[in-house]
Amino acid sequence: MKLDDSSLQKFGFIKRDTLGSINIDPLQTGGRLTEAAKQALVEWGDGYSVCDFCGGILDQIKKPPIYDFVHKALPEFLDCDEARVTNGARESKFAVMHSIGKPGDWIVLDGLAHYSSYVAAERAGLNIKTVPHSGSPDYYLDPEGYATAIEEVTKESGKPPALALVTYPDGSYGNLPDARKIASVCHEYDVPLLLNGAYAVGRMPVSAKEIGADFIAGSGHKSMAASGPVGVLGVSEEYAPIVFRKSKYNKVKEVELLGCTARGATVMTLIASFPDVVKRVRNWDQEVENARWFSARFEEMGFIQRGQKPHSHDLMFFEAPRFYEISEKVKKGRYFLYKDLKARNIHGIKSGLTKYFKLSTFGLGKEKLGIVADSFEEILKKYEDV
């Protein structure tokens, strides 16, 4: 590509077509910026802006109050002993896997684990044993499956796995497994547990200590109203010296974090939104009520919600047999749903999906959820003769 004036015109400021739409994309509902975060994005957008008064390590910066956020607020919020800011939940998971395990060790993952959990384990050189789920319609994860997996690893390798991970909730069906029971099972075998709370931390109450998780990973851009990439990591006192070990070449830098992580706008939008995030977590019961209301309304229309019932999270998976029938007959094919929703200013169902799809009701409130439900009903009626 020749970098002349003509070719460069495609870059520069780019407008976002979906801005202002009713957004039901699970990836985005929990990451919508607060007004304070939007201001912080501009105020702190210059590269290393937070380093005006840096003494050598990000989490020790007092002005702006990153130190207080990382070492006082986050441990209280996550209910853990020590915390750090990372470049995302996947980076949090990798830091734990890489520090706790050694190449050739084993990790146990749940059958609904996010792809990044697999990739992080692969990058850390770990072998993977998976705990199966029950399949459709519930996709239930039996905590005792962790005992079976741990025993299988021990039999095959001669020692227990270095780590176990549970996804809470999973990103496909929004199921909340019995994480406390899973932690108890893992600890019976002296296997530490990593809770992947990318869709939980910042949306709903989560306590690492109450669950018994040794590590907890959260996503700032997915669930804490922050500009990505940014995440959080909570660690128990027992494992903190291992995960947060210092470099022998630079005494203040932590190896697994490559010294410093989220600098500038990412960490400052996370901090800016934090007061609102703490408050919205207290409203979780209403979010669950809204999700259940929405699911019931959808099922009245013939959609089928898969996963836990009654559902306890905003992320939901639906089968849509009627939409699939329509897609096989109309001119627009499998893209008809995306286009009809776009015409109604609704965004979040991936283009081309009709047979099944997932969505999130988080933060929308009953009024907007009613608009979404009405729109789906209108689309069904539009094609009722097809």
Curated annotation (Swiss-Prot):
GO terms for molecular function: Sep-tRNA:Cys-tRNA synthase activity. The keyword RNA-binding does not apply. Its EC number is 2.5.1.73. It catalyses: O-phospho-L-seryl-tRNA(Cys) + hydrogen sulfide + H(+) = L-cysteinyl-tRNA(Cys) + phosphate. Pyridoxal 5'-phosphate binds at residues 89-90, 196, 219-221. Homodimer. Interacts with SepRS. This is O-phospho-L-seryl-tRNA:Cys-tRNA synthase.
